[in-house]
Amino acid sequence: MKFRKINCAVMFLLLSISIQSNANTLPADLSWENNNNAKPWASPLATKGGKFTDFILTFPPTLRTVGPDSNSSFRSYINANQLGLTDFHPNTLEIIPQIATEWAYGQDGKTVFYKLDPSARWSDGNPVTADDFLFTLDFMRSKHINAPWYNNHYTNEITSVKKFGDHTISITGRVAKPKEELHYYYGLVPTPKHFYKKIDKNWVKKYNWKIIPNTGPYQISKIKKGKRITFERKSDWWAADRPLNKNRFNVDKVILKVIRDTNIAYKHFEKGELDSYALVLPEFWHNKAKGKLYDNGYLEKFTFYNNSPRSSSGWFLNTDNSILKEKPVRIALAHALNFDKVIKTVLRGDYERLQAFHTGYGEFSNKNISARKFDLKAANKILDEAGWQQRGGDGVRISNGQRLSLNLVYGRKEHSDRWSILKQDALKAGIEINLRLQDSSSHYKTIMQKQHQIASLGWSTGFRPAFWQHFHSENAHKPQTNNITNLDNKNIDKDIEAYRAETDSNKRVKLANALAQQIHDSAVFIPSFKVPYTRGAHWRWLKFPDAPGTKTSSTLYSPFGDGGIFWVDSKTKIETKAARKNSTKYSSVNKTFDQYRENTSD
Amino acid sequence: MQGYFTQRLLLTIPTFIGITLLVFTLTRLVPGGPIERMLAEAQLSSGETASSAEGFGSQSLSEDQLDQLKAYYGFDKPIITSYLEWLWKVLQLDLGESTRYGESVWDSIIERLPVSIFYGVTTMILTYLICIPLGIFKALKHGAPFDHASSAFIFISYAIPGYVIGIACVSFFAANLEWFPLGGFVSDEFEELTLWEKIKDLLHHAFLPLIAYMAGSLAVMTFMMKNALMENLSADYIRTATAKGLSFSSAIKKHALRNSLIPLATHFGQNISVILSGSFLIEKIFNIDGIGLLGYEALVERDYPVVMGILVISAVLYLIGNILSDICVAWADPRIRFGEAK
Amino acid sequence: MLTPQAKKRWIKFKALKRGYYSFILITVLIFLSLFAELIASNRPVVIHYNGELHFPTYGDILPGTSFGYDYQWEVNYKDLQKQFNLEDKGNWLIMPVIPFNPLESDFIEGEYPPYAPSIESKHYLGTDMAGRDITSRLIYGFRIAILFSLFLLAVTYIIGVFIGALMGYLGGTFDLVFQRLIEVLSNIPILYVIMIVASIVTPDFWTLVLLLAAFSWMGLTWYMRTETYRENSREYVMAARAIGASHSRIIFKHILPNSVSILVTFFPFSVVSGITSLTSLDYLGFGLPAPTPSWGELLQQGTANLEYQWIAISAVAALSFVLTLVTFIGEAIREAFDPKKYSYYE
């Protein structure tokens, strides 16, 4: 749950704001907070130096972080080196300082005041000032960046940014929110005003491959198009001595190689050309990560249970469909799907059943809800009672001449095996499921046009459960909205509206829990799987603190962001390479870390 | 003859328009264009791991904003208007800009051209170098054990798709035995090498991909050569020549061989466009940044300007190739007169 | 009945042992695959239950209730067999050689798929990643692939021969227009078209046959056109025309029969390309929808999981075996149809 960077605009507007804002004066009654005592999560044993090589599947289409095609996976590498005002502690989720050293809350419940670190510097040596934050707003509102979501967010959600001298600002959002959410939704990332100067209609093209000054520990030093991108550690990074940054960001160079095939990339890893390899997929973990390299201890395996919001993945049932509009059919279908069998077989017992739409949101998740269990008797009984008692010669139920045959659209070839196993058992309940694989773009289009019967997909996670977009009737029965089940229920609508308007955390939690129950009762979503861990293998020269990750780590091998806690032991590296040549053995390592493991019963 | 070629040259124009118009229309019919891709990326969880997202995917865009996106990607006009605009640009040698990489399509293609040409041309030369002698030898030894054994071998290599051979080669020779690098066109430190080392490095990287490329074409060419030669060997004029006392080997050299090369020459022209397109699967496996891979990625990512750009080049090459193969045939066999048959 | 010429060719074909035996073998394989349900299926070939015989292979499912179980869905024949053996009441059933259907995931308690080949578990070639029997999938996959290529061949031949003959026979503008059309069609990236179709409807067997046919009839057309040109100028055609034979009669009675040799020699190679196309499409995931048994899909699984060698080896071996057989037939046909006898020089 990283505090995501929300980057940067029109010149004339900027001028007017800054002239006006110079006249601003701070409210007198602010109580400043700093959380300087937050506990570090790095290890004092860490040493600096060496390089870390990882791979990416495609070369990024652009280095911009906003605008067309900027939403590639590579953006996270750039964003991780562009600090925000504050961040969340990866273990405790408290607010921790970044560019801001102190913060305070306004009376209106929607304003936060920040004091900036005067020593903060851009990678080109220029100081980071309040103007860079004001510029962010202009930048993000500019039509020229061709990023309508950003335009919307920075226009509708963030009302104003004010300057109180060079190193103090305030940000005001549209509505009052609980404190931590103010930071999450209204926090800003500075945009180097001195660098961009002016945003015009050529911006998208002009900045495609420009390296933008940043404030984080690393900066891109070399780009070989289509092949590799190298980041280099800043030797005199301004925030290096902060307690939370000490012993982190240890390697001198981070190299990202483009390797287009995961199998081939794994071969590179085995050759020692990559330092680590994430092995979340069961096929990889169980099939590939074994053999001499592991037995001899050259490669070490780590499984780390994390605890953060889980992607809402599963089957979405379109209630506008003539068969699925009957709730008994939806409930029976949920009982006819043997997800546990899939987990126990092709997923090798690694994944867990997802129980509800929102899980991993702490108390915002309703832990009393569990997904409907595979139960053929129940499924058959419900269908018999719902008027589907007649079966055809092929065992599929029929009602009024209509077969109980449903199409499942999905966008990933790798999932075919999972769904064919479910299909076999569903037939026992008299339900035929036809698998319809589509390539990912058309899959998304089908769903957005609401042309599916059943759609398999996973929504990305947020900071807090989001109900309105997925379940409010305002988004039902029309294309291009996220209510893909077309759920249309007045009671649910009412609660969603209340949840959105509520600023008191406790009341919101209650509403969220109640909503989760109602959504479960409506049976429009059949939860599939969650991955409760992150895991991988690395060469033994990669060293980690006792806890190799944090509660919210999505990978152990992130060199940036709230990661960067591992280091490369150059002596071990030489030693290991020699040992490989003459087959010296070390003890094999396969560790599991479950200090943050969720209680599996929830 | 000259008239014939002029006519053929003129006829390439409607063909070219036909090809590009058809594909251009198709790009408009595809569900899920660049705009959908952009919307999807903003909202869906991409991997199996818990991922965090920006949290403002929840907002839907206004009509105005969607129109702005449509205009950015050039989807705001009727098909025929945008086709004509596109065609006009192509005539000025401007292939437009990639919607994904935002850079000129020309540049993307030219960047990858050397790699594709290297593999295409080398594969072709090597295939001819192996197939012609092998075909001749097999024709002369028709029915002998060597003929059978090599046929079986060639058929099997023909039956297994090139990409499968590629994967097998990488896992065995590159990963297990470590004889060859795992992929790439050249080493990372290529620029620092001496010329001799550069050549060695290039060949070291190219060896396995070339095997995968050649596996398929080997069979076709070898049998084409063998059949053609056998046909010619049984022709009357060879009998006459040998009857007149010309030794068999010089009969082959003087007459049969030359005539047998005609079908290969026909093939040559048609191969030109294939040279460039390569096989995206082989390129993917060996991590070679060629035109084939560019085209496939563009298709999957709905990067239409690149798709169209590659199509223009391959169509032009195909059309030129067809004419070239006529010229080749005419050159190899002076008896053939085009355009007079009617 | 066979014409004397055809008979001569058949005798010559038979004399070419490699091609002839391949032909017999493949015919037997195709024939057997048509009855694949009797060879590889989870349904028994015959059941003897309480004095009655059942043949469940074809037709409706037999629900559990018809054998005294309490469930409505198809009876689990493996359980039934165990129960029969246990009760020893004179009930019996005979399972096919391969007691798995190609869509069925068979899981072994305490082990994860894929399972290695084993005679004991009756997975003679092992299972794939989802626990489905590879032998069974190969058999059904073969049936689909070979039928696919035969139908594809039929459609392409009908279109190709018809248009080719007309182009050669009529010449002129018709010829010119179709030449351009062929050029246009041969330049359309077929994968692209299939991706587009796949995104609108999930392609089924017939959609794929028609789609591929629409883009592969052109190859034959060229040969047919040249052949017709040549035949057209022969004396017998001129004679037929002189006595007032109609166009269709000339084409169907005179030109086509004389072009048959060229058509037949292309036959096996079209089959090969049909099988290869379907396999590649399945490999890329644009072919028949999962979980249809398919060689391409098996190949994809095999290459992605090289550690489980039996998957890739089975797929590659089956593919190269069948393609090699067909190619051998092709070579023999070509030789049998060749009017010139080869000369050998020592």
List PLM regions with ranges.
Chain A
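Aromatic- and charge-enriched surface segment that lines or borders ligand/interaction sites
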Residues: 101-146, 170-172, 258, 265-268, ...
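Extracellular/periplasmic solute-recognition and catalytic clefts
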Residues: 143, 147, 221-232, 257-321, ...
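Detector for C-terminal structural segments
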Residues: 35-37, 56, 77, 224-229, ...
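Alpha-helical secondary-structure segments
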Residues: 53, 129-136, 168-172, 178, ...
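Gly/Pro-rich hinge or "lid" segments in bacterial periplasmic/extracellular proteins
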Residues: 82, 89-94, 186-248, 253, ...
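Surface-exposed binding/hinge segments that line
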Residues: 115, 150-198, 217-224
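Ligand-site clamp/hinge motif
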Residues: 206-209, 237-289, 423, 427-440
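N-terminal lobe/hinge region of extracytoplasmic solute-binding protein
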Residues: 26-40, 51-107, 138, 213
